[in-house]
C-alpha cells in the first residue's frame, strides 16, 4: 500500500486558486467565465 501524500492546506488552496485571486487577472476571469458557462456547481475553490 502506498501512502497518501496529499495533505491539503485550506489557506494555501484559497490563496492560489480562490475566487478573489481568479478575479484579479484577465486569464483568471476567463476561468470563472468558462466554469460558469459549463454550469459548474463550484466556480472556484
UniProtKB/Swiss-Prot annotation:
Keywords: Ribonucleoprotein, Ribosomal protein. One of its GO terms (cellular component) is ribonucleoprotein complex. Pfam families: Ribosomal_L34 (PF00468). PROSITE patterns: RIBOSOMAL_L34. It comes from the Bacteria. Residues 1-45 are annotated as: Disordered. Gene3D superfamilies: 1.10.287.3980. GO terms for biological process: translation. GO terms for molecular function: structural constituent of ribosome. Transmembrane segments: none annotated. Residues 10-45 have a biased composition (Basic residues). HAMAP family: Ribosomal_bL34. Belongs to the bacterial ribosomal protein bL34 family. This is Large ribosomal subunit protein bL34. The gene is rpmH.
Amino acid at each position: 500500500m502506498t501512502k497518501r501524500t496529499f495533505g491539503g492546506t485550506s489557506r494555501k488552496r484559497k490563496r492560489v486558486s480562490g475566487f478573489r485571486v481568479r478575479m484579479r487577472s484577465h486569464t483568471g476571469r476567463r476561468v470563472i467565465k468558462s466554469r460558469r458557462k459549463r454550469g459548474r456547481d463550484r466556480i472556484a475553490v
